[in-house]
Amino acid sequence: MIRLTAAAILLASAAPVWAETHTITPGEGAQERLQEALILAEPGDEIVLEAGRYTLTDGLSLDVDGVTVRGAGMDGTVLDFTAQEGSGEGLLVTSDNVTLRDFALENPKGDGIKSKGADNIVYYRIRVTWTNGPDPTNGAYGIYPVESTGVLVDGAKVTGASDAGIYVGQSDQITVRNSIAEANVAGIEIENSRNALVEHNIATRNTGGILVFDLPGLPVMGGGNVIVANNLVVANDTANFAPPGNIVAGVRRGTGIMVMANDGVLIENNIIDENPTAPIMVIAYTQPWEDERYQPFPLNVVVGDNIYGRGGDDPQLDGGEMLVAAFGGSLPPVMWDGLGSLYAIAGTPGWSLNLTEPGTAETAARPAPLDVPAPEGEFDRSGIGAPAELDDRIR
């Protein structure tokens, strides 16, 4: 029995040796060779994409647990979907414990990389770019994990998404860090998700920099427990180019950080500059809804110590010019609609619309300087962020 147990231990410890490396090179037949590797891979395998440009005409998919797809760098390995037929994602992942790292996608007809129901997924140094710049015909999302527990996005860069560059939806235990979101409608969006940490990112030249939303009518609602900290949110002044009907089509040009209908959000230690509508905006959901489960108010939102530069000087709001004149040339950095519950450290410059119910028109506002209580005690950070073991895959 002792010998059998020892043998079993040795066999188990040797299991990783069985993992295979599938190396793919650019050139003729790359589409078929790469998709075949994604289909035939076994758990623990690594698919290596050598440096070069891969001309692809169809989307790719991965449905095997525990696979790593590794390129030669976000500027070294480029999956070029300019000639893609159809309108699907560049890459769809529907399996757990997947690591995607060090490669780029350009010009997918639909989303860049979508992972659905893919728990413990890592996006590391991934780039998604629509090379024609802001355009409503671009794909909606660059990096798009949804319905997942355990999401790490680290060192990514997304440019040109017609909805959100980095979007995490209906998920739990999330970290988005060290990433750049530029010239998208929404730079980074956390939607209907809990326990998210958004830190050390750059959000610039988007319509809105960082959005934390909760929307009705989705399978997962009740977003909250989110920290937005240590980010550079600057010059988010791109005209909104979302297709009509998208929820982000209502985001005002010049929004820095926006919280809508979440419960428990901390905004601290960010540098927020040159966002002409509002450096920080905290509001209730503005549209009609029928879902009885839905809670539309921003609750327990805490604005901590942030660095505010220029902003609020060209607000895309009804009566914006009169508001600017009334406040002496620019609106204070923190804008609250007056609904729900907001806390801010002493001395936080801000203003309130003093609305009385969700969906009230801005013309019914009674603008006044911000008058909210200071936060009571420390923000509860427990359980926020991706599981620590996801970091081990990128070390």
Per-region residue spans from a language model:
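Right-handed parallel beta-helix
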Residues: 72-75, 96-107, 119-132, 149-162, ...
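Extracellular beta-strand/beta-solenoid scaffold signature
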Residues: 31-35, 57, 81-91, 107-114, ...
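Acidic, glycine- and Ser/Thr-rich low-complexity intrinsically disordered tracts
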Residues: 288, 293-395
